[in-house]
């Protein structure tokens, strides 16, 4: 009986019954736990908050979409002229703006380079306008350089050659005298000349119109006399040597000036940006203007010579030694210096943006004694104020600090963040022991990052740049979005691929986002150390004032990392809990069976449906463990720490990077047409912006859903396809070509050659081959590759220029008379010569010197240049200078500029003079020039080492002079018969027959050059 009972108890049916009972008990317990959870279920509002802010795929994806859209909108609004600038409502300001706009229309009526009659028209218009305005005031006066009192001769800085420039100035100067004569004056400067190919509305018509607006304001009734004297410099010939500004340095009024505001235009419309400032002391006053817009990123570009064009700022700062700022329009550069820089392509708001900011800056500096006025008595203040300025703006808010202060902030953050982080890590890993980070966790982000950047670099330079190298000209934003989406997708695949391969690895998914945040902050920490070290030694040529966003990106990542570390340091977790539950909410996305999101688990509970055996909460565990861990993970899913980290890191980082990148690329992308080096730089910058923009999103990439992944794939695919299909040049983003028609009288007296400069690989050849004159005459197009990716294409043309109505032969355009050959044949004497250049209706000529021994000499043999005043000149076979040659010794003549008693302009340079540029105001007055140069035996060291005496010959020491003169007059030489007398018909042809995606600019000081070679 006992055996029977015992056998019955161990029978399969009995064991099945016990199993069923146990299962029933567990099911009952599970149901009770679920019921307990459901009974404590929060209300609808709390569930909605949890649904939005819980760490779920849908929530993260929603946050990412909102961030991207908000970033695009905010940056567009901040940089938008229409949104950020409002037209004046004040009656006086409205009147000033209307008058300035009318002035701008008058100034931009025609092209007005220094080499054109249009330049005289603008000068005369401004002179009449100034005279009218100053007649209203008792404390305003003017001065005109046209009386020849400010002609100068000076050395022009150039790395390739030594050039001396003679310039006759016709600047227009206005002095608004201040009530306190002890205060140093403020200079406001703009130039009224344009290039020959442009109407000069933005460059620099709006600067000139702003000067007139300032003058209009201070000459208006009811406006008090300023405390500080204000000098307005309407200067000429900025475009080809910054000559008007250089001339002003020699004017008596310059001695009063200590500060300056330079108004310029290196783009065509839009907003006027604060390009750069000499120092913090003066830049800080720009924060008081009503619509501040600027970034020291452009300052870094200028100071490091990434931007090749220069402004008068350079003259005032480097040669004049005064302190000020450079305010200019900065985009787009493909319209800059072309016929599209006209009144029809700009907005009155652009003028008001420059004019209002200029008025505000002038008002704040001139209405009071500023701290810079007293720096001579305060050395400490002087040291700080003369530091480089770091500045930026956003939504008309302006931020500026001195470089030393940013260095101090950087050093503090670099030290404090690790000091806080290290103790927290010690607490977490040595005491709490609640966070497991293994080898895979530590290396997967660096591996993913490096692989993604390498692939991105290959795609950028070997695919995009090879297929469509000029695409950034029209679509840099498309390339950024393509690379941005690709970079996110690559990291998504690499990170989750590693998770999939090592899915059985203990602790693989343990707070992955925090690991990535910490590693990202470490990368920024290293970069910030390098940047701070360089900023502490900041100088021109090695400027780092534009790298200020690094500290902000580092701080944002560090705050997110510290928040995560604090959370772990206060978390209570038992070892048993760790052993049984090493999985974490951040699951890999490639394994659907093992990694369901929390939202689905919660839905199962609330619906009463059975819990799936493949739940992510605990693999291969008992049902009670499943239930316990499920409820635990559901509670974890309600954690909002991720959302705090996301909000702290991602939105602001995206905004900073995108705003900085947008300003940088929109200002530089057109320079891809200027050189191969610029092209490489732009592609590198595009790649940098794409990577930096994507990095803040990477810690949260484990939780993006299929919708966002699909969107990224679509963006990448559409962008990649556009690389093959989209043209880099269109009507809004034209191909920029540079034109000059050359006549070389040594080669032909009836044939001219059109030279066109552009980038190699551009459609330039096709454009030129389609010109009617080439097709009709069957002239060949000769193209030669130049340095740095440029190309010169030339063709002969029968479209002769009509530079002067009285000239019928090319030889009449340029006649060089040799007035005097060497004054002595003595082999050790100073050789000298003298020429007169006759050119009709001309203002600019350039002379290049060589010698029969030039190739063997390390420097030019010309040492002295003399430019004669014809009314003082007395021709004599015995005199080169106004004194006897026997009385003249080279050592007695001071190096640099000097004048003799007859008014001759003399410049001496012992290092040699390679070129001389002559600029005069008279249209028909000849150039009268003298030279002194060294004979071979005096200048050549090699002669000392020769055993044989080479006899002295005059021919051996002849001075060769290449004379080239330029004309910039467009329009018609004879208004009675316009169809036949177009001044430069070859230029008219390229304008008329080029496609609408081509814009034309000048290559030289004029659109036509005539050259001739002589020896003396």
Swiss-Prot record:
Feature: compositional bias, Low complexity: 612-622
Keyword Transmembrane: yes
Cofactor(s), by name: Zn(2+)
Binding site for Zn(2+) 2: 203, 239, 337
Signal peptide: none
Enzyme Commission number: 3.4.-.-
Region (Disordered): 1-36, 598-622
Cofactor: binding details: Binds 2 Zn(2+) ions per subunit.
Residues at the site labelled Transition state stabilizer: 336
Location in the cell: Vacuole membrane
Pfam families reported for this sequence: Peptidase_M28, PFF1_C, PFF1_TM
GO cellular component: vacuolar membrane
Protein's job: May be involved in vacuolar sorting and osmoregulation.
Protein name: Vacuolar membrane protease
Native species: Debaryomyces hansenii (strain ATCC 36239 / CBS 767 / BCRC 21394 / JCM 1990 / NBRC 0083 / IGC 2968)
């Amino acid at each position: 009986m006992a055996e029977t009972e015992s056998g019955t108890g161990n029978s399969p049916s009995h064991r099945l019954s016990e199993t069923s009972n146990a299962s029933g008990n567990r099911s009952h317990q599970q149901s009770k736990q679920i019921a307990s959870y459901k009974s404590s279920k929060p209300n609808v509002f709390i569930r909605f908050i949890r649904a939005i802010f819980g760490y779920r795929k849908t929530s993260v994806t929603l946050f990412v979409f909102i961030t991207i859209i908000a970033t695009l909108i905010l940056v567009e609004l901040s940089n938008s002229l229409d949104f950020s600038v409002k037209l004046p409502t004040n009656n006086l300001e409205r009147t000033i703006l209307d008058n300035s706009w009318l002035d701008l229309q008058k100034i931009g009526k025609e092209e007005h380079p220094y080499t054109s009659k249009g330049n005289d028209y603008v000068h005369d218009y401004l002179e009449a306008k100034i005279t009218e305005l100053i007649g209203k005031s008792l404390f305003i006066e003017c001065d005109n350089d046209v009386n020849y009192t400010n002609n100068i001769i000076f050395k022009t800085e150039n790395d390739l050659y030594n050039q001396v420039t003679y310039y006759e100035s016709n600047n227009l100067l206005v002095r608004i005298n201040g009530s306190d004569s002890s205060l140093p004056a403020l200079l406001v400067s703009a130039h009224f000349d344009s290039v020959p190919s442009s109407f000069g509305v933005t460059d620099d018509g709006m600067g000139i119109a702003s000067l007139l607006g300032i003058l209009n304001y201070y000459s208006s009734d009811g406006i008090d006399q300023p405390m500080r004297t204000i000098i307005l410099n309407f200067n000429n010939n900025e475009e080809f040597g910054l000559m008007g500004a250089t001339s002003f340095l020699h004017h008596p009024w310059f001695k009063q000036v200590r500060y300056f505001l330079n108004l310029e235009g290196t783009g065509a419309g839009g907003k006027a940006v604060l390009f750069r400032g000499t120092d913090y002391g003066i830049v800080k006053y720009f924060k008081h203007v009503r619509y501040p817009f600027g970034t020291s990123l452009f300052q870094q570009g200028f100071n490091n010579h990434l931007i090749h064009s220069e402004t008068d700022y350079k003259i005032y700062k480097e040669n004049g030694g005064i302190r000020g700022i450079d305010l200019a329009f900065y985009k787009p550069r493909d319209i800059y210096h072309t016929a599209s820089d006209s009144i029809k392509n700009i907005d009155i708001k652009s003028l008001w943006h420059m004019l209002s900011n200029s008025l505000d800056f002038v008002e704040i500096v001139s209405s009071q004694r500023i701290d810079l006025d007293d720096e001579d008595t305060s050395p400490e203040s002087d040291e700080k104020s003369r530091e480089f300025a770091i500045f930026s703006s956003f939504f008309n808010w302006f931020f500026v600090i001195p470089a030393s202060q940013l260095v101090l902030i950087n050093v503090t953050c670099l030290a404090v963040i690790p000091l806080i982080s290290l103790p927290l890590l010690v607490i977490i890993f040595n005491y709490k022991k609640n966070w497991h980070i293994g080898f895979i966790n530590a290396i997967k982000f660096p591996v993913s990052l490096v692989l993604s950047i390498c692939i991105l670099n290959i795609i950028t330079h070997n695919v995009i740049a090879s297929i469509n190298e000029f695409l950034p000209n029209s679509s840099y934003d498309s390339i950024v979005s393509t690379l941005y989406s690709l970079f996110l997708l690559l990291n998504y695949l690499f990170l989750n691929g590693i998770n999939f391969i090592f899915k059985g690895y203990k602790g693989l998914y343990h707070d992955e986002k925090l690991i990535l945040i910490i590693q990202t902050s470490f990368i920024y920490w290293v970069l910030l150390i390098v940047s701070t070290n360089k900023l502490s030694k900041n100088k021109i040529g090695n400027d780092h004032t534009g790298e200020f966003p690094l500290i902000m990106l580092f701080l944002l990542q560090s705050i997110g990392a510290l928040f995560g570390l604090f959370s772990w340091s206060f978390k209570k977790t038992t070892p048993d809990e760790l052993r049984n539950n090493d999985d974490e909410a951040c699951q890999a996305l490639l394994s659907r069976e093992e990694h369901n999101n929390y939202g689905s688990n919660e839905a199962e509970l609330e619906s009463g449906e059975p819990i799936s055996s493949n739940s992510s909460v605990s693999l291969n565990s008992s049902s009670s463990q499943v239930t316990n861990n499920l409820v635990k993970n559901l509670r974890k899913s309600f954690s909002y720490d991720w959302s705090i980290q996301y909000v702290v890191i991602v939105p602001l980082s995206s905004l900073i990077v995108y705003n900085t990148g947008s300003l940088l690329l929109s200002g530089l992308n057109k320079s891809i047409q200027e050189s191969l080096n610029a092209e490489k730089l732009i592609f590198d910058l595009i790649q940098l912006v794409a990577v930096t923009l994507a990095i803040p999103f990477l810690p949260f990439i484990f939780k993006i859903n299929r919708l966002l992944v699909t969107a990224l794939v679509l963006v990448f695919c559409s962008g990649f396809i556009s690389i093959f299909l989209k043209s880099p040049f269109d009507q809004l983003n034209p191909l920029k070509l540079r034109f000059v028609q050359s006549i070389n009288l040594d080669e032909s007296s009836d044939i001219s050659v059109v030279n066109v400069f552009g980038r190699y690989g551009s459609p330039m050849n096709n454009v030129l081959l389609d010109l009617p004159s080439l097709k009709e005459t069957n002239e060949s197009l000769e193209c030669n590759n130049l340095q740095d990716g440029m190309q010169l294409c030339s063709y002969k043309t029968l479209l002769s220029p009509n530079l002067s109505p009285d000239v019928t032969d090319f030889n009449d355009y340029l006649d060089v008379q040799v007035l005097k050959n060497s004054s002595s044949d003595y082999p050790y004497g100073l050789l000298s010569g003298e020429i007169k250049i006759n050119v009709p209706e001309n203002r600019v000529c350039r002379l290049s010197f060589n010698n029969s021994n030039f190739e063997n000499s390390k420097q030019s043999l010309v040492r002295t240049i003399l430019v004669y005043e014809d009314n003082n000149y007395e021709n004599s076979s015995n005199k080169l200078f106004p004194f006897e040659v026997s009385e003249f010794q080279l050592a007695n003549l001071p190096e640099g500029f000097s004048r003799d008693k007859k008014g001759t302009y003399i410049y001496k340079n012992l290092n040699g003079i390679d070129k001389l540029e002559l600029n005069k105001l008279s249209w028909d007055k000849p150039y009268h020039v003298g030279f002194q140069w060294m004979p071979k035996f005096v200048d050549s060291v090699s002669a000392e080492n020769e055993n044989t005496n080479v006899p002295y010959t005059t021919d051996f020491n002849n001075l060769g002079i290449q004379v080239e003169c330029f004309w910039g007059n467009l329009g018609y030489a004879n208004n009675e018969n316009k169809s036949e007398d177009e001044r430069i018909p070859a230029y008219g042809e390229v304008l008329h027959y080029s496609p609408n995606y081509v814009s034309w600019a000048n290559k030289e000081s004029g659109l036509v050059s005539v050259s001739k070679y002589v020896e003396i």
